UniProtKB/Swiss-Prot annotation:
It holds the Pfam family Intron_maturas2. Keywords: Chloroplast, mRNA processing, Plastid, RNA-binding, tRNA processing. HAMAP family: MatK. The keyword Plastid applies. Usually encoded in the trnK tRNA gene intron. Probably assists in splicing its own and other chloroplast group II introns. Belongs to the intron maturase 2 family. MatK subfamily. GO terms for biological process: mRNA processing; RNA splicing; tRNA processing. It is found in: Plastid, Chloroplast. This is Maturase K. The keyword tRNA processing applies. GO terms for cellular component: chloroplast. InterPro entries: Domain_X, Maturase_MatK, Maturase_MatK_N. Signal peptide: none annotated.
Length: 510
């Protein structure tokens, strides 16, 4: 009975189907919405959208050409003779892919809304703040023993991406259109997707690629963690019977033969694995307090699961297992890339149950971060805000915007940096970064008005950039009144600002 219930939980929830996504491709407002949404989410990345090309006139022409096609869904061999792709192919593909990314997210949005209405937020696995890593570091970080990390491979064949979406999107026309796009831009004769094609596709269609990539990775991650969680409930069940009764994939013979020989007949070895998982920068990172033997078995388990069921070519020799003590003093995650940027300090929390009662001191770990100056300067240099040594330069690609738009873009970057490092205790490096952005903004405005920085500031005054100095107003503090009749002092402490939508280059810096 318990196994049948687990099997039902493993099945993907298909209660929210949408069979009418394809007609939305011919709606103008979808492309406008996709463009505006992409523009608002751009922070540090150069806006490669359609500031100079995008217009509703182009969209109308695009939709008209799509309507005029008698056979839009064709094979890749006939695409060279198709006038739809021969005319300005890159622009049309980029526009449709962004619109398609918005359309295909509709079933996921409906599932999310329904989950929130039923107050079943636990079932929405994607509702995780990037700052959930900090409580993990404070509570679990000092007690872990081993870390395993490896690159997450791309699917062997493009058709696997389409097959994954078939579970969520029940619209054959949309899936055929997706297949046409993929076959048009990638080489079908290659078993593994070329890295150059991936890089080009990611740069031109970030939203579209991230959606496909996350959908693909989420599938085998969900199965793997389901089995990890269920291992606690099947300790007395024979492993071979356990796999056969769940029957989560067809190629089970080799899998069972390997694991009955290598793991034994029961799940007693899976007792309390304490496995923590992070997916970051295309890597899968496992951290555990188990022995190296169990870590190797979990690694082998994941590799066979992905290769047999999802046709993902994992290379076990590239998944390294090292003592976690090597990483405790050199932690690189979420933009904190310096070896000294993450520190665990002991702090004393004093609590009082009742007024005039005795005080209790509890010692706990406190995560303290410092702003890493070198990676941040590298990110700003990559985005052409400064040179390699941190000297501010103008942003010529923004010189065509209005003055208010230029200032708003720079202020938005500074505000997000302040929010991201709001919980840091040492911010001298952050002040230097904000100085680089302020001076880069002034040089960009001076370049636009064909003037020097000194003359421009003298003419307009320093009030033009006063928004850069409002950092303290953007930082949230928690203020607690002290429950005492003698003193009514207020205690103020640092907290992490959690309203982070997109950090882009900060959290993806290599």
């Amino acid at each position: 009975m318990k196994i049948e219930k687990s099997q039902r939980n493993l099945e993907i929830d298909r209660s929210r189907k949408n069979d009418f996504l394809y007609p939305l491709i011919f709606r103008e407002y979808i492309y406008t919405f996709a463009h505006d949404r992409d523009l608002n989410r751009s922070i540090l990345l150069e806006n490669v959208s359609y500031d100079n090309k995008y217009s509703l006139l182009i969209v109308k022409r695009l939709i008209t050409r799509m309507y005029q096609q008698n056979h839009l869904i064709i094979s890749a061999n006939d695409s060279n003779q198709n006038t739809f792709f021969r005319y300005n192919k890159n622009l049309y593909f980029q526009m449709i892919s962004e619109g398609f990314a918005v359309i295909v997210e509709i079933p996921f949005s409906l599932r999310l809304v329904s989950s929130l209405e039923r107050s079943e937020i636990v079932k929405s696995h994607n509702l995780r703040s990037i700052h959930s890593i900090f409580p993990f570091l404070e509570g679990k970080f000092p007690h872990l023993n081993y870390l395993s990390e490896g690159l997450i491979p791309y699917p062997i064949h493009l058709e696997k991406l389409v097959q994954i979406l078939r579970y969520w999107v029940k619209d054959p026309s949309s899936l055929h259109l997706l297949r046409l796009f993929l076959h048009e831009y990638w080489n079908l004769n290659s078993l593994i997707i070329p890295k150059k094609s991936i890089s080009f596709f990611v740069k031109k269609n970030q939203r579209f690629f991230l959606f496909l990539y996350n959908s693909h990775v989420y599938e085998y991650e969900s199965v793997f963690f389901f089995l990890c969680k269920q291992s606690f409930h099947f300790r007395l069940t024979f492993y071979q019977v356990f796999l056969e009764r769940i029957d989560f994939y067809g190629k089970i013979e080799h899998f069972v033969e390997v694991f009955t020989k290598d793991w034994g007949d029961s799940l007693c070895l899976l007792k309390d694995p304490f496995i923590h998982y992070i997916r970051y920068q295309g890597k899968s990172i496992f951290v555990s307090k188990d022995t190296p033997l169990l870590m190797k078995k979990w690694k082998y388990y994941l590799v066979n699961l992905c290769q047999c069921h999802f046709d993902v070519c994992f290379q076990p020799q590239k998944i390294h297992i090292n003592p976690f003590s090597l990483y405790k003093h050199s932690f690189a995650l979420l933009g904190y890339l310096s070896s000294s940027s993450v520190r665990l300090n002991l702090s004393v929390v004093r609590s009082q149950m009742l007024e005039n009662a005795f005080l209790m001191d509890n010692i706990m770990n406190k995560l303290d971060t410092t702003v890493s100056i070198i990676p941040l300067i590298g990110s700003l240099a990559k985005m052409k805000f400064c040179n390699a040594v941190g000297h501010p330069i103008s942003k010529p690609t923004w010189a065509d915007f209005s003055d208010s738009d230029i200032i708003d873009r720079f202020v938005r970057i500074c505000r997000n940096l302040s929010h991201y490092y709001s919980g840091s205790s040492r911010k001298k490096s952050l002040y230097r970064i904000k100085y680089i952005l302020r001076l880069s903004c002034v040089k960009t405005l001076a370049r636009k008005h064909k003037s020097t920085v000194r003359i421009f500031l003298k003419r307009l005054g320093s009030e033009l950039l006063e928004e850069f100095f409002t950092e303290e107003e953007q930082i949230i503090f928690l203020i607690f009144p002290r429950a005492s009749s003698i003193s009514q002092k207020l205690y103020r402490g640092r907290v992490w600002y959690l309203d982070i939508i997109c950090i882009n280059e900060l959290s993806n810096h290599e």
